[in-house]
């Protein structure tokens, strides 16, 4: 071995060998159990950041560990390569998005290979390649064929800066999640996926995912937002129409003091036409048009409303109720109408107080005298209680009244029980170029016609003009003009492209069969590899990507293309990489470049630090001293191997070659097998990579000390050193591969079997017991491992120094914990 650890020579050498030998290709036909390890694939922004390094290092440890445990591992990588940054770069630099994207992919691929990640590069996918988006279009058509895609005019979230529509999930606090521009409302014809058809099963099947973090499942539950309530009709006064209201609190309906319509509700125009209220209401409606959903419904937003001049009739009490419009009611949610019950809803209480509307109590806390039913409230009462001011339902518990009132609505025909979901259908249309074209055609004779599957892919054209605020595909006549596949007449192509989440909602399926030219994947291949056994990515994808991927998987199962109905069996959401207490980002100027760290210390050091510095699910604080420490540790491993190299090359390590072991050799073997046991558990069961690395470091220290013994059992030393290398291999693959080779092994360390724990080696003949006097440590004593409590107490009483420590005091009792401590209680 060379005297110095030269990572700059070692790492490229092994990276090339691994690729040339195709060491990490998954086996197509194998008797081994399968394991599918996957990190969320990256957007090719141009350079890896430390968040990438952490994500991919975590999955690589898992993949390498599973290979060594006898699994046939699928560990692929690809590029989520459509999206706005490429298009914005095209506008700014006059560079075609494809050119910008492929250049970035080449650079990031080089960086990934320099990290030594054990990818099966034969399965690499790129979503902007026609061979890939052909099948994104194919999947769109399958969903369309099965009635899960439709087009409608809708008030959509519009980002003026990005000049495109945003899904509800892409609006954060009223702003575009990408550029932070305030989002407005705009009416456009858009394509939608009917994810709401799967709302209930998406909710129910979260119970099938014990390997997912509770936080992520809760976020999805809240986003789906299932509620059980009733829809009831309020007749309009002097009018033939009705207002349908959805409520989860039909038990409070006798307390309704107003009904609110969304400003966009079609009834509003009928109610105000020709009245004295028309102008003011129209002005209010116009003002609402410029506001997006979040801005209108946020708890921070002041509730605004206006009386329409019209009234409706409460179907239970027969009372006349004023009709208002307000900013917080959205036409897209429920029925676009809500009933206002100020006494029992905090928002309604606030609204009624502002506009001096009546507040009528209809539920009292249990035990409250009925005489207090009309006492003015200081705040809304939202708990359960007894019904008052509610006609025939007075005296009932409100939960009983809820059922009876629903029964009445259904019996009398003015309402019914109803389950509602917060989840909306997925709007996938984007007015941008760099996305998969929507494979639909508009014909004046035939209407909307899907592109035949044998004509896919619908390719992105090159003859487009990039201008801020304009959809580039509308500038390409060669793209727009086409022939109707049904009648052969002139027709126009759809010029919107798909949301990039369309491509990332099925990429994990393409990895199972990436070179299939006829189908997105063969059922046999997908059924073999799916589910993904371990998925790793940021919690910021909890709703969008993870929900859409679950939806796609369930639908494709229903279409007959898959056996599984959940894509990811286990999910790990890794923490952020921080510097100075804040997430690394260019805008904060606190970025550490992976390339700089790798060039200075090597990829193994970068990997080791990022895995050692914190548990994977926690945020990691970057620390230069910690990086230096990991580099020094790898140098210690190198020097340790160099010191043992010559003698170990000629020494076997068979089970029968240890011979008679002295105490030092037994202790060394015990620590070796304790470390094997601990690392196996930490990596395999808990992903506690930091404690696994710590255990390996302790074993290295122990082997250094063992080397100083007067007599070294070389078989024991070899077992310890080889165990160190194998246990360290998933974390630091290059240095361990090099040392393994230098020790005379011809096979790759990464193809070695993971070491087994020798239970006999774990048996201790002696243990160290702590001796305390009134809880204060006085001494540590060696005793037989199997000593009983009585024997331990007797041995302590015979200690010469016990009299010295207890002089002038009375021994009250001696508490023993065999194998751990003895506490002598005195006064």
UniProtKB/Swiss-Prot annotation:
Keyword NADP: no
Reaction(s) catalysed (UniProt annotation): tRNA(Leu) + L-leucine + ATP = L-leucyl-tRNA(Leu) + AMP + diphosphate
Pfam families: Anticodon_1, tRNA-synt_1, tRNA-synt_1_2, tRNA-synt_1g
GO cellular component: cytosol
Origin: domain of life: Bacteria
Entry's localization field: Cytoplasm
Enzyme class: ligase
Annotated motif 'HIGH' region, positions: 42-52
MF annotations from Gene Ontology: aminoacyl-tRNA deacylase activity; ATP binding; leucine-tRNA ligase activity
Entry binding sites for ATP: 586
NCBIfam families from the UniProt entry: leuS_bact
PANTHER family, sorted: LEUCINE--TRNA LIGASE, MITOCHONDRIAL, LEUCYL-TRNA SYNTHETASE
Name of this protein: Leucine--tRNA ligase
């Amino acid at each position: 071995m060379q005297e110095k650890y030269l990572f700059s020579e070692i790492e490229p050498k092994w990276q090339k060998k691994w690729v040339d030998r195709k060491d990490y290709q998954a086996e197509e036909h194998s008797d081994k159990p399968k394991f599918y390890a996957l990190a969320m694939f990256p957007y090719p922004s141009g350079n890896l950041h430390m968040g990438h390094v952490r994500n991919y290092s975590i999955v690589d440890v898992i993949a390498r560990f599973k290979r060594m445990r006898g699994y046939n591992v699928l560990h692929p990588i690809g590029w989520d390569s459509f999206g706005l940054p490429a298009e914005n770069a095209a506008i700014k630099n006059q560079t075609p998005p494809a050119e910008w994207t492929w250049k970035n992919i080449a650079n990031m691929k080089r960086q990934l290979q320099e990290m030594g990640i054990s990818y099966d590069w034969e399965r690499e996918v790129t979503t902007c390649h026609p061979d890939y988006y052909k099948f994104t279009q194919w999947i769109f058509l399958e969903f369309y064929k099965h009635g899960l895609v439709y087009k409608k005019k809708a008030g959509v979230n519009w980002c003026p800066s990005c000049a495109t529509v945003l899904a509800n999930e892409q609006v954060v606090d009223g702003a575009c999640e990408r550029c932070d521009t305030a989002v407005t409302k705009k009416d456009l014809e858009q394509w939608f996926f009917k994810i709401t058809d799967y709302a209930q099963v998406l909710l129910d099947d979260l119970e099938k995912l014990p390997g997912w973090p509770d936080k992520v499942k809760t976020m999805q539950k809240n986003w789906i937002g299932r509620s059980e309530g009733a829809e009831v009709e309020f007749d309009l006064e002097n009018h033939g129409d009705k207002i349908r209201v959805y409520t989860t609190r039909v038990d409070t309906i006798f307390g309704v003091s107003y009904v609110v319509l969304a400003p966009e509700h079609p009834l509003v125009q009928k109610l105000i036409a020709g009245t004295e209220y028309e102008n003011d209401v129209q002005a209010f409606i116009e003002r609402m048009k410029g506001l997006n959903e979040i801005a209108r419904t946020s708890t921070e937003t002041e509730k605004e409303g206006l009386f329409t001049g019209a009234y409706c009739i409460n179907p239970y009490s027969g009372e006349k109720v004023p009709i208002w419009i307000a900013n917080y009611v959205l036409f897209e949610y429920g029925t676009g109408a809500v009933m206002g019950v100020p006494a029992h809803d905090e928002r309604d209480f606030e609204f009624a107080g502002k506009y001096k509307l009546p507040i009528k109590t209809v539920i009292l806390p249990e035990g409250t005298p009925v005489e207090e039913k009309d006492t003015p409230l200081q705040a809304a009462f939202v708990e359960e209680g007894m019904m008052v001011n509610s006609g025939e339902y007075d005296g009932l518990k409100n939960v009983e009244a809820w059922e009876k009132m629903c029964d009445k609505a259904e019996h009398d025909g003015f309402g019914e029980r109803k389950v509602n979901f917060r989840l909306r259908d997925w709007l996938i249309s984007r007015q941008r170029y760099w996305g998969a074209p929507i494979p639909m055609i508009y014909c004046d004779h035939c209407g909307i016609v899907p592109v035949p599957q044998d004509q896919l892919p619908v390719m992105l054209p090159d003859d487009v003009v990039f201008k801020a605020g304009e959809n580039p595909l509308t500038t390409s006549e060669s793209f727009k003009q086409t022939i109707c596949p049904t009648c052969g007449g002139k027709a126009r192509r759809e010029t919107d492209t798909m949301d990039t989440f369309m491509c990332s909602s099925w990429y994990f399926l393409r990895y199972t069969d990436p070179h299939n030219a006829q189908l997105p994947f063969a059922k046999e291949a997908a059924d073999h590899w799916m589910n993904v056994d371990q998925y790793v990515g940021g919690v910021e994808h909890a709703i969008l990507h993870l929900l859409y991927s679950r939806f796609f998987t369930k639908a494709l199962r229903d279409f007959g293309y898959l056996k599984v109905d959940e894509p990811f069996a286990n999910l790990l959401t890794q923490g952020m990489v921080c510097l100075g207490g804040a997430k690394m980002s260019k805008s904060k100027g606190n970025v550490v470049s992976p390339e700089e760290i790798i060039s200075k210390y090597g990829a193994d050091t970068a990997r080791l630090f990022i895995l050692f510095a914190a548990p994977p699910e926690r945020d990691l604080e970057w620390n230069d001293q910690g990086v230096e420490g990991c580099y020094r540790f790898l140098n210690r491993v190198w020097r340790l191997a160099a010191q043992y190299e010559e003698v170990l090359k000629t020494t076997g390590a068979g089970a029968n070659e240890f011979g008679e072991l002295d105490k030092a050799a037994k202790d060394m073997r015990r620590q070796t097998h304790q470390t094997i046991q601990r690392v196996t558990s930490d990596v395999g069961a808990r992903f506690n990579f930091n404690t696994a690395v710590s255990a390996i470091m302790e074993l290295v220290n122990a082997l250094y000390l063992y080397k100083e013994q007067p007599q070294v059992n070389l078989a024991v030393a070899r077992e310890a050193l080889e165990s160190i290398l194998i246990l360290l291999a998933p974390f630091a693959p290059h240095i361990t591969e090099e040392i393994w080779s230098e020790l005379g092994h011809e096979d790759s360390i990464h193809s070695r079997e993971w070491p087994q724990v020798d239970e006999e080696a774990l048996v201790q003949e002696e243990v160290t017991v702590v001796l305390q006097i009134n809880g204060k440590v006085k001494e540590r004593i060696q005793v037989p491992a199997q000593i009983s409590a009585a024997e331990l107490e007797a041995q302590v009483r015979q200690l010469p120094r016990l009299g010295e420590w207890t002089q002038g005091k009375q021994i009250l009792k001696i508490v023993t914990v065999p194998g751990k401590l003895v506490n002598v209680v005195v006064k």
